[in-house]
Amino acid sequence: MSRPQFDPAAYAAQLEDKKARLAGLLAPFAAPAPEVFESPREHYRLRAEFRLWRETGNENRHYAMFEQGDKHTPILIEDFPIASRRINELMPRLKDAWAEPALGFKLFQVEFLTTLAGDALITLCYHRPIDAAWQQAAEALAAELGVSLVGRSRGKRIVVGRDYVEEELLVAGRRFRYRQPEGAFTQPNGEVNQKMLGWAYEALGEREDDLLELYCGNGNFTLPLATRVRKVLATEISKSSVNAALANLADNAVDNVSLVRLSAEELTQALNEVRPFRRLADIDLKSYAFGSVFVDPPRAGMDPDTCELTRRFERILYISCNPETLAQNIAQLHDTHRISRCALFDQFPYTHHMESGVLLERR
């Protein structure tokens, strides 16, 4: 993780540049002007990861970050204004704690995971085996800080408390509860994520047919979108994300979602009846009347076959973390679908990265 150039005074201009960039990429497809959802200027990032750096000639260690491609010139961090207030409050207290050998010896990396709801988990990574002495010290520290702790060393993982944090997000007047596991992907900007969920909920609209969701992760979008349709079939390949999504569905009493651990390629084969899958043994695909598909793919976007799969739906709701691959995918779909809505979500202030969304509807 490299440190963004934090400059609140430049935020508005940087956001305008992103808006212009997205509009330019989507201009060939006659897209409407993007709806823009701003980020808080500071304390917006709910996750942070730091290496530890020892000063030459003494035992002092600091939180450190590095510019991309340079692992030898540390940027020493005393506070981190883009991170949540909870992370900033925990950083000096943890730094005091690692003076104890049981916690600090050969500690080389620290990862913070927090939520808008105030929960926190800290992962401590070591170049040595962790043992009962570590666990005893970690239990005392977790109680003192009011957090869960996870210790990691080669081949070993010890959890003190829980290995996930609990989040609450408000979408269309309803609070959804999420378990967000340590080590799994979660949206880093909680406030913007909440806005993104609200936009997707509104863009999909109230439907009497069914929704297919690809790349569902921990169910971030699944929970609110499930309230807009008759049934959802959601797919995900990460086992930890599938387990988190199942727990989140149960915690929120959402009972119209079937979740299967299949890749997009495998699902395409199943829908085309190329071959059967044991993981679909309890699911009758012919019972679904799919009208919409929701996709939130990785930075590489959808592969051509998955793009062709989405073409068969009346509505394609697409959230993207890479506007270039979004534009490439839209180019493949443009002959059958038009962009009726698009949005820019500023998940990553002070960087060139952006999250965007489009609703494509059949011509």
From Swiss-Prot:
Keyword field: Methyltransferase, S-adenosyl-L-methionine, Transferase, tRNA processing
Pfam families, per database record: tRNA_U5-meth_tr
Database matches in PROSITE patterns: SAM_MT_RNA_M5U, TRMA_1, TRMA_2
Binding site for S-adenosyl-L-methionine: 187, 215, 220, 236, 296
Flavoprotein keyword on record: no
GO biological process terms on file: tRNA methylation
Annotated function: Dual-specificity methyltransferase that catalyzes the formation of 5-methyluridine at position 54 (m5U54) in all tRNAs, and that of position 341 (m5U341) in tmRNA (transfer-mRNA).
Protein name listed in UniProt: tRNA/tmRNA (uracil-C(5))-methyltransferase
